[in-house]
């Protein structure tokens, strides 16, 4: 008999249900989490033993959205879900980041978390539900896990924080922030903001962490009721004697190596020391394990670097804690791109381009929550040569997708509205060198490239990565961290914004005990660094260029009567197709009659506008037009008078005298002046050559050209 255990609680404006024991009973743990009709089924499976020779923690998080959850069929030829989309990849990272640091040091058993969206309410995003589900499943599994965590989304509407805002509320919000943490520590923050202050951002983090405590309490209660016993796992014993011996042989040498400021030279020296120590120790005792020695050397390396920072000594590259590396900023570095910039900060460098396109270049995204169009794309590429390595090149990896989204968040708040700038914009950041904070270099480069392209952004933005080294009550916040400081530190804290406020905040914390005071110090220090970088950027370009690139399409907008849209499009799109081929332009028509003509050549755009005006012009009775004979029949001739309009010249209206045979007076393709006699209710046009000739003889209206 299936007997599920259910726990229900109120979480802000939503009701959350945790249910276990009903499905996937062969998994280590499984939980169905529902929040107002959005349901995510989360399973956890953990291997009882680590693989032989395993030297890292193999945690995998898979997040998958099923089309049936929204009552839809998947797109594509096969009509089934395929590889994860960008949104699914980002949500998988969102789940992974706060749970990864909560597994104990030395735990190397394989763990897989699978979150499947099985029902979706369009107003309730599944990401928070999936994070709660992962926390609950891990807490029930018995796998060594120092959780549970809670998760919350925080909005900022009418100067008030809003817990887990609906999708409609998010459209009015100046903030979209996700925070996750344990009962006493914040572990992860991901956000985008509309130029909020540092205090407002910190307040949102604290608010979200306080509100999610009810989630943690209910997961703990569920685990106490039906959770499996915690595995009898013990951390591998530390060989203290070997630790001492390694320290004797390597500590001083590693300290000297970390005085080498150039990254590649330092890495080479550190590798040389490690290889030497391992070889010497194995020569002394071949029963020793090279992997264990390598792990001890890694821990010693970390202690050496952290100790220097905590003692107030200069950092790896000789800087003080709040110093920014040397900056080099250049714009317009590529001749044919619409906008470009080369941003260099120390040994981190980004070549960033901006490309302008029309509305048809926008990305149409078919998501579980519905379809949407994205007019601003930012892509981040991290090739292996940027760190002096060889490697596979191909489609973007999870990290590249995540870094690209963070950089996009940093710039999004300053992008102009569609009405102010009707272009689709694509920014690409090519990381050509990397030694820490390449995503924030991408924010700086994107701002510069957009201004170089003439995109009227509201303000320049810059990004900075902060780090933290903390031992007990002693802590040091580092500005503009190197890759090593990121790897060996306790916090990665990235902030992007303008002079007026924050546009994006991302935080990943590896330890507990990060207080509000520490976060406040980091945010304030980041603001100073950001303003310094903006000052240097403004020396290169201090405002968007007054005009877009000569190689970019110029968009000209005109308005036509919505009833005339069908005339411009034509049967099966024939007219608009012919227009684009004839004029060499791109033409887009909206339902309200707005027509956008994009062309790199101004004369071509003017030609297209003139043709559209002709097509949509009303035929005036009594007006003379220059037309072309298109068809000859027994009772007269049909004459095209422009804009795809055609009228009949009856045989009696060809000449002043009686006409026996139409072809005696008119030939196919002949150009003639015609006067409009009548437009009937059905839109049929009656023309007269006879009347046009009479008017011309009397010196009346000159004929209007019809193309």
UniProtKB/Swiss-Prot annotation:
GO terms for cellular component: cytosol. Residues 553-612 form the KH domain. It is found in: Cytoplasm. Gene3D superfamilies: GHMP Kinase, N-terminal domain (3.30.230.70), K Homology domain, type 1 (3.30.1370.10), Nucleic acid-binding proteins (2.40.50.140). It catalyses: RNA(n+1) + phosphate = RNA(n) + a ribonucleoside 5'-diphosphate. Disulfide bonds: none annotated. Its main location: cytoplasm. Its cofactor is Mg(2+). Pfam families: KH_1, PNPase, RNase_PH, RNase_PH_C, S1. NCBIfam families: polynuc_phos, PRK11824.1. Belongs to the polyribonucleotide nucleotidyltransferase family. This is Polyribonucleotide nucleotidyltransferase. It comes from Edwardsiella ictaluri (strain 93-146). The gene is pnp.
């Amino acid at each position: 008999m299936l007997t599920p255990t259910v726990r229900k609680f109120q979480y802000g404006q939503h009701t959350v249900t945790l249910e276990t024991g009903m499905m996937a009973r062969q998994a280590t743990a499984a939980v169905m989490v529902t929040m107002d009709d959005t349901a995510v089924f989360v399973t956890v499976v953990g291997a009882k033993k680590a693989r032989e020779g395993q030297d890292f923690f193999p945690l995998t998080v898979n997040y998958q959205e099923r089309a049936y959850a929204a009552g839809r069929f998947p797109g594509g030829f096969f009509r089934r879900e395929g590889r994860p989309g960008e949104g699914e990849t980002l949500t998988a990272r969102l789940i992974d980041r706060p749970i990864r640091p909560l597994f104990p040091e030395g735990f190397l058993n394989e763990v897989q978390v699978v979150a499947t969206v099985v029902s979706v309410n369009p107003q309730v995003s599944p990401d928070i539900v999936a994070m709660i589900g992962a926390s609950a499943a891990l807490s029930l599994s018995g796998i060594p896990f120092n959780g549970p965590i809670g998760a919350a989304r925080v909005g900022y509407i009418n100067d008030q924080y809003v817990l887990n805002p609906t999708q409609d509320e998010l459209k009015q919000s100046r903030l979209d922030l996700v925070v996750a943490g344990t009962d006493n520590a914040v572990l992860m923050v991901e956000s985008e903001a509309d130029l909020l202050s540092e205090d407002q951002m910190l307040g949102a983090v604290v608010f979200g962490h306080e509100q999610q405590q009810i989630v943690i309490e209910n997961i703990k209660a569920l685990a106490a009721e039906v959770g499996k016993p915690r595995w009898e796992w013990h951390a591998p014993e530390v060989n203290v004697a070997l630790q001492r011996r390694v320290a004797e042989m390597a500590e001083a040498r590693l300290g000297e190596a970390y005085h080498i400021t150039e990254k590649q030279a330092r890495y080479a020296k550190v590798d040389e020391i490690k290889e030497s120590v391992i070889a010497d120790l194995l020569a002394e005792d071949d029963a020793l394990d090279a992997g264990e020695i390598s792990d001890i050397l890694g821990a010693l390396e970390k202690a050496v670097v952290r100790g220097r920072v905590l003692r107030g000594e200069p950092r790896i590259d000789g800087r003080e804690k709040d110093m920014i590396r040397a900056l080099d900023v250049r714009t317009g570095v590529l001749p044919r791109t619409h906008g470009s910039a080369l941003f260099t900060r120390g040994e981190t460098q980004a070549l960033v381009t901006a490309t302008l396109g029309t509305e048809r270049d926008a990305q149409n995204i078919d998501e579980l929550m519905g379809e949407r169009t994205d007019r601003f794309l930012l892509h981040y590429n991290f090739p292996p040569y940027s760190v002096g390595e060889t490697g596979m090149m191909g489609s973007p990896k999870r990290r590249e997708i995540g870094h690209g989204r963070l950089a996009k968040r940093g710039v999004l708040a300053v992008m102009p509205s569609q009405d102010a700038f009707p272009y689709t914009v694509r920014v690409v950041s090519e990381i050509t060198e990397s030694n820490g904070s390449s995503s924030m270099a991408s924010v700086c480069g994107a701002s510069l490239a957009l201004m170089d392209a003439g995109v009227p952004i509201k303000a320049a933005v810059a990004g900075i990565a902060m780090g933290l080294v903390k031992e007990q009550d002693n802590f040091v916040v580092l500005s503009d961290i190197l890759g090593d400081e990121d790897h060996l530190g306790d916090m990665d804290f990235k902030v992007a914004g303008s002079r007026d406020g924050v546009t994006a905040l991302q935080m990943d914390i590896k330890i507990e005990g990060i207080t509000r005071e520490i976060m406040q110090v980091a945010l304030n220090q980041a603001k100073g660094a950001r303003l310094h970088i903006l000052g240097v950027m403004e020396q290169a370009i201090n405002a968007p260029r007054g005009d877009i690139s000569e190689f970019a399409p110029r968009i000209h907008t005109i308005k036509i009567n919505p009833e005339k849209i069908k005339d411009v499009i034509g049967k099966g799109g024939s007219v608009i197709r012919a227009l684009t081929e004839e004029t060499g332009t791109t033409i887009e028509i909206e339902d309200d009659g707005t027509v956008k003509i994009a062309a790199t050549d101004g004369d071509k755009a003017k030609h297209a506008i003139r043709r559209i005006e002709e097509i949509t012009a009303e035929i005036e009775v009594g007006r003379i037009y220059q037309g072309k004979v298109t068809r000859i029949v027994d009772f007269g001739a049909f004459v095209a008078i422009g804009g795809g309009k055609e009228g009949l010249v009856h045989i009696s209206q060809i000449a002043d005298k009686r006409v026996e045979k139409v072809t005696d007076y008119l030939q196919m393709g002949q150009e003639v002046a015609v006067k409009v006699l009548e437009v009937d209710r059905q839109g049929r046009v009656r023309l007269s050559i006879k009347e046009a000739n009479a008017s011309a003889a009397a010196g009346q209206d000159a004929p209007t050209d019809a193309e």
